[in-house]
Swiss-Prot record:
Short name of any one Pfam family annotated for the protein: KdpC
Primary localization class, coarse: membrane
Keyword terms, alphabetized: ATP-binding, Cell inner membrane, Cell membrane, Ion transport, Membrane, Nucleotide-binding, Potassium, Potassium transport, Transmembrane, Transmembrane helix, Transport
Quaternary structure, from the entry: The system is composed of three essential subunits: KdpA, KdpB and KdpC.
Name under which the protein is recorded: Potassium-transporting ATPase KdpC subunit
Protein's gene: kdpC
Location of this chain's protein in the cell: Cell inner membrane
Organism: Burkholderia thailandensis (strain ATCC 700388 / DSM 13276 / CCUG 48851 / CIP 106301 / E264)
UniProt GO MF annotations: ATP binding; P-type potassium transmembrane transporter activity
Membrane topology according to the record: Single-pass membrane protein
Role noted for this protein: Part of the high-affinity ATP-driven potassium transport (or Kdp) system, which catalyzes the hydrolysis of ATP coupled with the electrogenic transport of potassium into the cytoplasm. This subunit acts as a catalytic chaperone that increases the ATP-binding affinity of the ATP-hydrolyzing subunit KdpB by the formation of a transient KdpB/KdpC/ATP ternary complex.
Signal sequence, renumbered to the chain: none
Superkingdom per UniProt: Bacteria
Amino acid sequence: MKSLFRPLIVVFVVLAAVTGLAYPAVMTVFGQAVFPSQANGSLIEKDGKVVGSALIGQQFDAPQYFWGRLSATSPMPYNAAGSGGSNLGPLNPSLKDQVKGRLDALKAAGTDLSQPVPVDLVTASASGLDPEISPAAADYQVARVARARKMPEADVRRLVADNTAGRQFGVLGEPRVNVLKLNLALDAAQTAQ
């Protein structure tokens, strides 16, 4: 009986060492050597202090900032521990209430609602943590942000264009604008004036 369990124990120990120690250690070293920023969470710094991550959205609700997608996490917006889809169907009254609330917030901030509102400004993403909006959603907010910052709209549009990332490898995904990076660029541009 002892001879039956010995190979099982040896295989278990070897596989545990390979999959639990060796593989994670090799991947950590590889990630730190080849992709250090991504391996450390794609952190964004301002004046030497970490202000966020390029991978997780942040709440911006002041009129002088671009607003991101709604967060599906509550009670704390953009809480990664509470990530998960909102799973609200198109006929769910809660979805209608969320969209109406966001439209009211856009209207209160002085946004012109006579034009169609990009869907990513009034709905949450699948994870509820999306840090990016579409160029159309950014363009929709240009007038409000420019007015609140007393900046020419052309300057704000240029910053949006400068912070628009294209499709990955030219074919994957859609063009997108990272809201945190754009808002930091706005702050920097206004400070430079």
